[in-house]
């Protein structure tokens, strides 16, 4: 991240802020979408986070920490705006099984759907750690710093998220295959 660009944005330069947003918005949106699992909600949360970033930017003490600081604001916005007791919708698919050549493809779809359901079932704090570590590529120390939590907490959240995903994936492999006309 260009330190000069962050400094200019901190001083109220709207063009500099627009350039910062251009540089980080795709990554921030990807994080929000992966945490929330809802593209529309992710867009709304991103917009709210960008407004907060603009308002709080003059108070940013260290321009080199802009990205981590922006991630922190975004994740907090995800926590605040996520529907607390929402029941996640399930994707409905009709899966053909009469063709042997489709078997591997069906298994891949089934595996992906199992992981998606399991991921949606994770608490938001575990999803945030998982996404920041595995999708953004932050180290666990960086994840802890971004989220403002101890390193050990980041490690345990990642451990429990990974364990839950692995259990759900393994449980899905024990289910019988769906026949054509059945709903996934």
What are these regions (language model features)?
Residues 10-11, 34-37, 50-65, 84-88:
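Sigma70-family region 2
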Residues 30, 44-51, 55, 64-76:
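Structural recognition of an alpha-helix C-terminal capping motif at a helix-to-coil junction
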Residues 129-133:
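A short pre-motif secondary-structure segment
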């Amino acid at each position: 991240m260009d330190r000069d660009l962050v400094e200019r944005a901190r001083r109220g330069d709207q063009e500099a802020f627009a350039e910062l947003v251009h540089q980080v918005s795709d990554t921030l949106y990807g994080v929000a979408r992966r945490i929330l699992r809802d593209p529309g909600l992710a867009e709304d949360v991103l917009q709210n986070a960008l407004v907060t970033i603009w308002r709080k930017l003059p108070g940013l003490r260290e321009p080199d920490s802009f990205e981590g600081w922006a991630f922190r604001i975004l994740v907090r916005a995800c926590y605040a705006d996520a529907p607390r007791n929402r029941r996640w919708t399930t994707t409905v698919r009709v899966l053909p099984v009469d063709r042997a050549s489709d078997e591997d493809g069906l298994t891949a779809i089934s595996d992906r759907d199992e992981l998606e359901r399991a991921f949606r079932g994770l608490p938001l704090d575990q999803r945030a750690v998982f996404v920041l570590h595995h999708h953004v590529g932050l180290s666990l120390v960086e994840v802890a710093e971004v989220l403002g939590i101890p390193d050990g907490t980041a490690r345990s959240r990642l451990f429990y998220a990974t364990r839950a995903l692995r259990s759900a994936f393994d449980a899905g492999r024990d289910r019988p295959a769906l026949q054509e006309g059945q709903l996934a």
